């Protein structure tokens, strides 16, 4: 009995220390920090334009409310890492023209309709699997060698000039004009 009481007291003390030492984070909230948004320029954009209550966390409602991210309009050209972008599940338009990204994985972003990565001269890899609502893609003036648009069945316009493309897969993109 004495050992059980001691174990219970230790457990209670540990729980209290954890509760006092760790700030509460509601389920589903995403911290706007270097772990979730490694790129400082993107993190600043998210803080300024997506974190509506300025608590340095994105609630599910804040993530769902973001339908357009336009770095070009805001004259942001120093983003090198788009990690964290997939938290915005209702994203319809992503305009990152002229930024420093080398890879962009948007696979599974089923609501994305318009993507503009033109002028991202360091962009080597673009993944769009599962972007079934994508209708417009501008990937001109990048450094792409392959572009796989398989499964982007809603595509109507694609611009991919001024790349080093050796392979272009448009299978299933029957609406292209």
Spans of model-derived segments:
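N-terminal capping/linker segments that flank leucine-rich repeat
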Residues: 3, 12-17, 21-100, 104, ...
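Leucine-rich repeat
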Residues: 102, 123-124, 145, 166
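Conserved hydrophobic beta-strand positions in leucine-rich repeat
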Residues: 67-72, 92-96, 113-117, 126, ...
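Consensus "Asn ladder" position of solenoid repeat domains
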Residues: 74-77, 99, 120, 142, ...
